[in-house]
Amino acid sequence: MANKMKTRKSAKKRYSFTVNGKVKYKKQNLRHILTKKSSKRKRNLRKSGNLSCFEVKRIKTLLPYD
């Protein structure tokens, strides 16, 4: 009997899949030390990011059952 692949929990916390199969993630640098960052920069950091098609393949190997 073959072993099941394990899900990488660190990747599961950081990435999620959209309905179309794209990978979504939350941008960094919005936790603390926000006073020196401009409002425009903070507003852009609130948007979710999308990975390129090359990185999607790597993330799908880390998250086999999602």
Swiss-Prot record:
Any Pfam family hit: Ribosomal_L35p
GO BP annotation list: translation
GO cellular component entries: cytosolic large ribosomal subunit
Family: Belongs to the bacterial ribosomal protein bL35 family.
Designated name of the protein: Large ribosomal subunit protein bL35
Alphabetical keyword list: Ribonucleoprotein, Ribosomal protein
A single GO molecular function term of this UniProt record: structural constituent of ribosome
InterPro entries: Ribosomal_bL35 (IPR001706), Ribosomal_bL35-like (IPR021137), Ribosomal_bL35_CS (IPR018265), Ribosomal_bL35_sf (IPR037229)
NCBIfam families documented for this protein: rpmI_bact (TIGR00001)
Organism: Borreliella afzelii (strain PKo) (Borrelia afzelii)
Highest taxon in the source lineage: Bacteria
HAMAP family referenced in this protein's UniProt entry, alphabetically: Ribosomal_bL35
